[in-house]
Swiss-Prot record:
Its main location: nucleus. Signal peptide: none annotated. The gene is MSH3. This is DNA mismatch repair protein MSH3. It comes from Arabidopsis thaliana. ATP binds at residues 817-824. PROSITE patterns: DNA_MISMATCH_REPAIR_2 (PS00486). GO terms for molecular function: ATP binding; ATP-dependent DNA damage sensor activity; damaged DNA binding; mismatched DNA binding. Component of the post-replicative DNA mismatch repair system (MMR). Forms the heterodimer MutS beta (MSH2-MSH3 heterodimer) which binds to DNA mismatches thereby initiating DNA repair. MutS beta recognizes single base mismatches and trinucleotide insertion-deletion loops (IDL) in the DNA. Keywords: ATP-binding, DNA damage, DNA repair, DNA-binding, Nucleotide-binding, Nucleus.
Amino acid sequence: MGKQKQQTISRFFAPKPKSPTHEPNPVAESSTPPPKISATVSFSPSKRKLLSDHLAAASPKKPKLSPHTQNPVPDPNLHQRFLQRFLEPSPEEYVPETSSSRKYTPLEQQVVELKSKYPDVVLMVEVGYRYRFFGEDAEIAARVLGIYAHMDHNFMTASVPTFRLNFHVRRLVNAGYKIGVVKQTETAAIKSHGANRTGPFFRGLSALYTKATLEAAEDISGGCGGEEGFGSQSNFLVCVVDERVKSETLGCGIEMSFDVRVGVVGVEISTGEVVYEEFNDNFMRSGLEAVILSLSPAELLLGQPLSQQTEKFLVAHAGPTSNVRVERASLDCFSNGNAVDEVISLCEKISAGNLEDDKEMKLEAAEKGMSCLTVHTIMNMPHLTVQALALTFCHLKQFGFERILYQGASFRSLSSNTEMTLSANTLQQLEVVKNNSDGSESGSLFHNMNHTLTVYGSRLLRHWVTHPLCDRNLISARLDAVSEISACMGSHSSSQLSSELVEEGSERAIVSPEFYLVLSSVLTAMSRSSDIQRGITRIFHRTAKATEFIAVMEAILLAGKQIQRLGIKQDSEMRSMQSATVRSTLLRKLISVISSPVVVDNAGKLLSALNKEAAVRGDLLDILITSSDQFPELAEARQAVLVIREKLDSSIASFRKKLAIRNLEFLQVSGITHLIELPVDSKVPMNWVKVNSTKKTIRYHPPEIVAGLDELALATEHLAIVNRASWDSFLKSFSRYYTDFKAAVQALAALDCLHSLSTLSRNKNYVRPEFVDDCEPVEINIQSGRHPVLETILQDNFVPNDTILHAEGEYCQIITGPNMGGKSCYIRQVALISIMAQVGSFVPASFAKLHVLDGVFTRMGASDSIQHGRSTFLEELSEASHIIRTCSSRSLVILDELGRGTSTHDGVAIAYATLQHLLAEKRCLVLFVTHYPEIAEISNGFPGSVGTYHVSYLTLQKDKGSYDHDDVTYLYKLVRGLCSRSFGFKVAQLAQIPPSCIRRAISMAAKLEAEVRARERNTRMGEPEGHEEPRGAEESISALGDLFADLKFALSEEDPWKAFEFLKHAWKIAGKIRLKPTCSF
């Protein structure tokens, strides 16, 4: 048939000609079968033959329509009739069409059924070479992806090409939606030979994606770019449940303490990390806030019903700025109402499924026991934690990831006795992981300490920084490892490292056996590999591709073989430590885990079952290496395909004989194989199928070839199904090695963290901290300490300070001084150095001797929390209340300007009472910054335990007697003594407050200070407040002194307003002295 000429633009948009006047027969219309939906993606020779026969029997080319027929004359009254009908609707009442009365196409019917099963999922339905959205999903896709949505039959629809699936899934997931991918579950070849050959393709939900499950799902990173990924950040799914508890009451009838008990389970599905905790929490939910801030979840699962305050806090945390996804689950979903029974039942099902599919694993489990979640472990968990665990099980079951919770070795409690949990306030106010300017990592303590080379090392270091150690032996072990690596660095440079690495086949060999060279080469090689921690978890979930599997196993094998050259074994005795390459106990333990023969041998064994060349060229059907005892069904399917292909290839001989062409060969064009190409004038049998042609040749498929290709396509599809089942079985067998591989990757991450801390200690003038025994008094002794973050900015211009706090001596410092003098920087510096030391890092000081702290608590800055319904002062006192309840005698407490959010009298009283409680009841180490001089009087009640300090400065008076017009030079050095001036007007000038406002403020300050001075003098003399009349000679002399001082200030003052205030006050004093003639001078 000839190709019809494309219409012009004007003809394309012209109204169509009217249909014939006769009405169609309704009976005939109903009897016609539904339209056939063709969404085939593979070649079907039999279908091509049927199409060819149909075209051959078709009528010849139809004559062209006349121009008048194709482009009718426009009706001038058409627009007028449209407006009349639009503005004057029919008086008949409009009855909307119900869903039951609609006539759906077969594809739409499938979509309706799928949407009824998954109402909360945005579905991407595979239709041919595109993924289509329907209804509301199409509108969401149009808004998020920026694509066009239009009406098609009964639904709005939009689509994206199949090769861009990965990119668009990530964008939709990142926008907070749950995405379901619906794929065709049959191919054209299988469909053409099945009972459904005339119906639509069968489709089913093949994958679900959310923010917490995306990285653990099938590899969809292709084509998305780095900016769309989630990088090295954790993607925790956190489930929260709570229940009411009876609040404690104070004697005055005010409720206090805790009102709920909270259970939390957090799962990092992409790494297999599972954390849990149960604790009492107060009305402000400060404990829950600390957990949420520490885990930084990507998704929250709320167990309903939740208390109103918990729900309010979590919803506010997952606001638009945080981009955290929220999903709710009812606790009524348990079949028998018992969460414990539900978890045990799920674990038994998973265990039975694992062991049933793998006989070797069953024997191994019987011999030594699997590392899994046992009934004993579940029964020992707190009640609410089990509820949260059951909800998490049920939630992950829809994604197929519930098996990760079965790995009991991954579980750890957040309230470990060996780790310190920093509160949400401490993490935020000390800028431990994020800065307070833009919320990024730049400028934080973690960013300053992070010199890791791998993403999983960076994740582990983040955990170390937010959870410092509380065990002196563990801290010393880390410091020993850091010291040894730092000493080994010596004069080695990165250029020497690269020259000492040579290639030996597919492996890297190390010329020098020195430990640092081995460690650096391994970490450098791992930095160039993929995220193997998430890789082994995807393998465990059976979502990894063959290329990723090979890359992960090769990385683990490379690391293990290189570190094996150090000759360190797990059962080595201490007697060989003197001659050993590595002496640190922690380093030897980590090295032995990575280079374990079990890990290396299993990695090699798994790689030997795969065809790397086939994986590189993308031949998925030839990836698995078959043998007599391995994948027998796959071997049979491959053999069947090979036999059919050989039969087809051998049939060329018969065609040579039939056509009398000796050199006839099959031709392959555009992926179509076994073509017979003949000249245009050649005569061929009538049943030969014409496939394509050129000017001089025509290419055919004889009936034998058509039948053979059909048989080959069917055998190939069967091979693909068997291959997928064999690959899934191969991945399932990985479960028995998962624990060993996970431990090896975790050890690699720990080595990377220790190497990072060693780099930090060498790049800057850091010192190893010393820790006193636990039985000794708590102390902090830092000489020439420096702020670890500000020092990187100021370099040599930073001014160091000493800090000495001792439980049996001075354990509280009250710090005063001018604004912008460095008070907050100093107290932050002490806290950050303490945290760094307990992380196991060297610290920025010339000497550091500390006691292991069980907590670092801070109350700094002024901020409200409107979304949580908290004012600035409530937020301030809530943080102080949390500190008072939580701290102990082994804690470091930092309070910065407590009480400034209310009136002066209330603020001073609250600050004084809080500090007195900490000193008398808790006896913890305290750094207290204040602008209230009255607070310093507390040192009288605690002689020798409280010291007053201020940040030093120099002043230069412009004019003698001037008030607050001094030039101030900040020295940033902490010295003993109380500072009574804050130089607030200097800060006002720096902030560019209008000069008129500053002058007026100075005038008011002078007046207020004069009144306060008079009030204090009257108080000393025993006069009632407000009575300023001098009595007796001494009072008159004092009044004259004030008179002359005011006159002196007025004469030297440049500002007329200020001078006037001094003169006015002097006039009042003179008037009072004049009215007392009995006074003798």
